[in-house]
């Protein structure tokens, strides 16, 4: 059985995090690529051992909450046997997000093969197990959706055969052949580890701006950036839906398994894309998914809140429910139970924060 460590709170399966509501494990799906059957299997594990719901993350992964501490060996075995733990040494550094609609709609190239190569190379390099667990790779198919987020290293396609390697932001990059992109991203990750140790074990490439500017071939860029939200509804024959507050219930997981034609993409905005399932949108909406960008649920997110988190002073999800049921049009809004603002969305949004020193005060901030 695996116990909880407090040295690093970014959880994995073998390194859970202990929250107020029990242990939390996180499963990475590089590029958000999974299947309806996989989500159904994880839902069954969550029902057997934890709270029952699956929590989608802003890095296109899945968390199981409310688990016993230590986490049962049977849970770990089930996750391993399902293929969700391909590298026990690297599980917490397999943080790769990609353009969710790549190969479905828009974009210049299908980047899924690059994501697979990057993940395989990452897991094959022993030194890269030492990357900070918050270190993030992004792979953009050229539409500018994920390269506008906060990240550490990235690739953005220019055409089918070329792209930019991005260092810490979309304004610094190196022109590379697409066929070399995975190897060069991994080489830069190794160089970052060396540079970060010399600088006092920093966590992110953005903290080493002077190092980034000295990388051979680096240039200042002015790339156009798009919204980070994935369009909802029928998109390129796919069904694109938002999962309210990122919580996938057992019934919803069963609906996804029944309606998905195989592949499912978890989006960084805590939604799901089901290729080839545009005709099944009525069933998905009936199950509680959102396919309309004018719905309040498409604009509201929240941290897990009380009582699940001891730092939170309010039940953020209950507050989000009241906001959504008000029927008012809302700007992109994130509700946080403390100043840490866990789970805040990428891009411009308003924060509603309960400062820890003033439990009755709700503060709105434009971010």
Language-model features and meaning:
Residues 3-18, 291:
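Intrinsic, low-complexity N-terminal interaction/targeting segments
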Residues 156-229, 254:
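An acidic, glycine-/histidine-flanked metal-binding catalytic module
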């Amino acid at each position: 059985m695996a116990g909880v460590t407090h040295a690093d709170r970014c959880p994995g399966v073998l390194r859970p995090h202990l929250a107020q509501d029990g242990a939390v494990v996180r499963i990475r799906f590089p590029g958000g690529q999974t299947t309806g059957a996989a989500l159904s299997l994880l839902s069954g594990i969550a029902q057997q051992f934890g709270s029952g719901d699956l929590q989608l993350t802003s890095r296109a992964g899945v968390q199981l909450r409310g688990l016993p501490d230590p986490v049962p060996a049977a849970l770990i075995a089930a996750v391993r046997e399902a293929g969700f733990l391909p590298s026990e040494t690297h599980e917490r550094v397999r943080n790769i997000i990609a353009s969710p609609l790549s190969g479905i709609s828009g974009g210049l190239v299908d980047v899924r093969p690059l994501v697979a190569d990057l993940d395989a190379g990452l897991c094959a390099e022993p030194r890269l197990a030492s990357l900070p667990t918050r270190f993030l790779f992004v792979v953009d198919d050229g539409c500018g959706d994920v390269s506008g987020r906060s990240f550490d290293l990235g690739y953005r396609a220019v055409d089918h055969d070329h792209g930019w390697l991005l260092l810490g932001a979309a304004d610094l990059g190196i022109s590379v052949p697409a066929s070399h992109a995975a190897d060069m991203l991994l080489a830069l990750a190794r160089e970052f580890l060396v540079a970060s140790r010399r600088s006092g074990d920093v966590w992110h490439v953005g903290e080493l701006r002077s190092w980034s500017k000295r990388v051979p071939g680096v240039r200042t860029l002015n790339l156009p950036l798009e919204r980070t939200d994935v369009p909802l509804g029928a998109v390129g024959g796919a069904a694109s839906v938002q999962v309210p507050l990122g919580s996938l219930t057992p019934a919803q997981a069963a609906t996804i398994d029944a309606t998905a034609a195989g592949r499912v993409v978890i989006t960084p905005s805590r939604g799901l894309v089901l290729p080839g399932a545009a005709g099944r949108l009525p069933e998905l909406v009936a199950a509680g998914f959102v396919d309309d960008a004018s719905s309040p649920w498409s604009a509201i997110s929240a941290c897990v809140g009380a009582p699940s988190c001891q730092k939170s002073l309010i039940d953020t999800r209950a507050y989000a429910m009241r906001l959504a049921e008000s029927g008012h049009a809302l700007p992109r809004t994130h509700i946080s139970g403390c100043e840490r603002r866990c789970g805040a969305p990428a891009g411009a949004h308003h924060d509603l924060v309960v400062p820890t020193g003033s439990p009755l005060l709700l503060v709105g901030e434009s971010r």
